[in-house]
Amino acid sequence: MTIYGDMDTSIIKEKPKGRKDIITKVVKEKDLREVLLKVLEEIKLGHQVYVVAPMIEESEESTLKNVELLREKFDLAYHGKIPMGVLHGKMKKDQKEEVMHDFKIGKSKILISTTVVEVGVDVSLATVMIIFNADRFGLATLHQLRGRVGRSDLQSYCYLICNEDKERLHVLEESNDGFYISEKDFDFRGEGDLFGVKQSGDMSFSLADIRRDYD
């Protein structure tokens, strides 16, 4: 956008007709039970659920959740009675397509995945997004992931699971507006280097303000 700043842009601030704001909540892992109950409630209504983890496999050097661990956790919580799918970037193309097809047609009710579902996935009956270790993702990524639900007139929910109370995560509780979220992200991260590769940090201008003086 900096390089092509002289180009005309279109700004769309309205949701498609009938879409509702996604109710978003930051939840500590010790309070996960309320989320699991909500998942069960939504599935009984015929709806579906995304669960996102930052890792594919368990690592001795990391306490981050992974898709395999979460598959076991959710399978145990629901006594193996809810059909689930697992999706991640190491799977072969035909495997990924099969998992997504099963989820789209409702054969699986919970899809446990890495961020490969961030864009390009449209399942209108998906009404719950649960993101583990949410503090490890940027606001833009979290907003994109949240956008996988709320794709119909059904009320949808997003739960950000995080053991530490991170101020920036509450921005997503406050708003569904991508423009507002990007501005808050700008405030947290700084403007970075306009003429280099640094994407965060303060440029330390004495007078200029990038947002105020962009024209």
Residue ranges and their predicted role:
Residues 1-2, 115:
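P-loop NTPase nucleotide-binding module
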Residues 3-71:
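Conserved interdomain linker/interface between the two RecA-like ATPase lobes of SF2 helicase motors
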Residues 32-47, 68-215:
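C-terminal helicase module of SF1/SF2 nucleic-acid helicases/translocases
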